Amino acid sequence: RCHPLGLEAEGDQVLTRMLDAMNADPARRWTEADVAALGMDPSTVRRAFKRHYGMSFLELARQMRLREGTRALAEGAPVIAAQLDAGFDSASGFRDAFARLFGHPPAAMAGGAQGLVAEWLDTPLGGMIAVADAHNLHLLEFTDRKGLAAELQRLSKAAGGRIGLGRTAVT
């Protein structure tokens, strides 16, 4: 059985302390200096995250920030507000990170849409993107999958060019 947050993650004080700090401030732009200020060795933290999650703590922190921006957009916030809420100083940095994940810039997906809607889901295995309409789940994929943007672009094209952000009864 798979227990990604089971004894191994719970027993690793480095993971536990760092995740607690990251969850307490998801919009923070973490640096290795911040990790050192918490009394931890950045290389130890980096190795622990790579071993357990397959990504560095900086990559996970960036995903957490992007998740916050995505949720703000899904709630109807303007793109600039979502960018700032997510801790991105640069509009282009937020746009680029969003487009790498979704295959479209945030303005193309902001607000509700008729038909397909994408939602960011937190799971014990990591972040996932679900795309559904009112009756069917069309896509469920991990956010760190390299082919996700291309898959979302193909799905968007098949759906007439637009996928909104939000939630449906399916998700």
Question: Where does each model-flagged region fall?
Answer:
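Basic nucleic-acid-binding alpha-helical/helix-turn surface characteristic of O6-alkylguanine DNA
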Residues: 1-92, 100-102, 107-171
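An internal, acidic/charged active-site-proximal segment
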Residues: 96
